[in-house]
Amino acid sequence: IGRHSGGVLGEPDALDVVSRYARNALVLVVVMPFYAKPGLYAVPDTSDVGRIFLEARRRLADRQVLLGCARPPGLHKRVTDTYAVMAGLDGIAFPADGAVAVASTIGRPFHQEHACCSIKLGAAPRPAQSRTCAA
């Protein structure tokens, strides 16, 4: 998310493409311009990221949608992770402080798995009605 200089441009089209194929999960990441020359990339606005989370959840309601570890740190990460919980994403790699509290506050069950978000060995896709937030 945010690959076009921090802007959201092709993400809705990418979700269209992904939604046409039978896949168990989608792992979303947010551009992190740490190693780019200053000014080359901008960090995407958290509200844009949140809108993509909602759209991904809506379009892929029968599949797992996960937030990978690649995302900007600090306040951006805390806000992004809050949006991920509230949008109904199924997992967050290395959740920010407060993400579990948000899940608990809004009544989303959660559990912790010690695995990479892109490797779900032995895990069957969860039905839409029993979504949990893996922290």
Specify the residue positions occupied by each region the protein language model found.
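Canonical radical SAM enzyme core domain
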Residues: 2-13
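Auxiliary Fe-S-binding modules of radical SAM enzymes
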Residues: 13-135
